[in-house]
């Protein structure tokens, strides 16, 4: 199923879309630029899930999930608490390991480089970048907090969105 929520934050309208089922959240996306970009990202999530043999129900149904994601973004709910609501369907063991580590170790308002995450998990920065790029749970799994050593805003459909999320959390470059 798909649920939507619209929120105002820092003078911008943020639309959050959640793909979910009875096991929990299957995917999250958001837009600061209206419905067209949001629909592109929903299609990306659905294609990603289907490519991993995860069944998706495309009917629209209200849920509390968009509000939960917004509460994580604004700091009223912790990433760790919200992580329990994720279905984790179709993820590899490596992705689960990376996402779990990130949720537990990189807190609101903090950033970390791909290299430092890689060192902590004994893998390569490129592997971490790939996991961040495939992250179906942005905001709850805070891939926006992982930055490049030289180019801060890698592996994101819109670098301005990553910067916006960090600004909401109080991070300043």
Curated annotation (Swiss-Prot):
Name of one Pfam family that matches: DNA_binding_1
Designated gene of the protein: ogt
Source organism: Pyrococcus sp. (strain NA2)
Xref: PROSITE patterns: MGMT
Enzyme Commission number, as recorded: 2.1.1.63
Segments forming a coiled coil: none
Protein name: Methylated-DNA--protein-cysteine methyltransferase
Principal location: cytoplasm
Compartment(s): Cytoplasm
């Amino acid at each position: 199923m798909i649920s939507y929520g619209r929120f105002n934050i820092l003078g911008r309208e943020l639309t959050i879309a959640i793909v979910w089922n009875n096991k929990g959240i299957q995917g999250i996306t958001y837009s600061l630029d209206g419905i067209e970009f949001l629909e592109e990202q929903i299609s990306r999530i659905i294609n990603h899930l289907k490519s991993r043999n995860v069944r998706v129900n495309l009917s629209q149904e209200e849920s509390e999930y968009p509000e939960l994601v917004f509460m994580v973004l604004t700091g009223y709910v912790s990433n760790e608490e919200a992580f329990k609501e994720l279905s984790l369907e179709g993820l590899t063991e490596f992705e689960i390991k990376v996402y779990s580590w990130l949720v537990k170790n990189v807190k609101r308002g903090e950033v970390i480089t791909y290299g430092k995450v890689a060192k902590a998990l004994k893998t390569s920065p490129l592997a971490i970048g790939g996991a961040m790029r495939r992250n179906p749970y942005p905001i709850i799994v805070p891939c926006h907090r992982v930055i490049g050593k030289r180019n801060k805003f890698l592996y994101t459909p819109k670098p301005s969105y990553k910067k916006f999320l960090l600004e909401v959390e109080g991070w300043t470059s």
